[in-house]
Amino acid sequence: AGIAHIKETKENKDFYYKVNRDLAYETARKAKGEAVRQFIFLSSMSVYGIENGVIDKNTPLNPNTAYGKSKLEAEELIKKLEDESFIIAIIRPPMVYGKGCRGNYPRLAGLALKTPIFPKVDNKRSMIYIDNLAEFVKQLIDNQSGGLFFPQNAEYVNTSEMVKVIAEAHGKKVVMTKLFNPLINLMKRNNTVNKLFGDLVYEEGLINNNQHNGFINFEESINLTEN
């Protein structure tokens, strides 16, 4: 149970809490009452409330949107249900991409197919391909694991490289140039520009051993998404 990618307004703020917090908690409570052994809650990187930088074990939880706040409150409620007979696994994935996914990926894909020139920016972002996320959840179930998890692809993603690979998946070529970089740096106060070209990663120390077993590599994940 959850909602995302809906523009937040004063009118729909309560809806985020009803679905992402209340419904998620009631689902977990029902599962425990039915003697389910493990409950996996899909939370979000949004619980940190930051748009730039490196997230590590000391990064404070400070969500600044109804989405992030509702996810964090759900985590806190669901965690209270945990005991020896009810395992709780909380996942905080970064941006998820794949066929049919919403968010920033479709914007980048659209740019990759329309523009012959794109900024060459040396940024890094944690992302995860939807099938890799599914594989990660499968591993949690197979191992009956509990705790807090930060799944991501085996490599950080560079925005310029992603656009290049998307274009190549369609037989197109995009020329990368640093000519636009000064303008991009000035525009990073814009939330959309910052999400595309800023840095936002999970520190590698948060990644669990053997997490990437069975994961699809970045280039193949783009080809599967685009074709």
Residue ranges and their predicted role:
Residues 1, 39-45, 91-93:
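SDR active-site strand-loop-helix element
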Residues 62-89:
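Active-site Tyr-X1-5-Lys
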Residues 136-192, 216-218, 222-226:
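Mid/C-terminal beta-alpha module of Rossmann-like enzyme folds, strongest
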Residues 110-128, 132, 139, 150:
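A conserved pocket-lining segment of Rossmann-fold NAD(P)-dependent short-chain dehydrogenase/reductase
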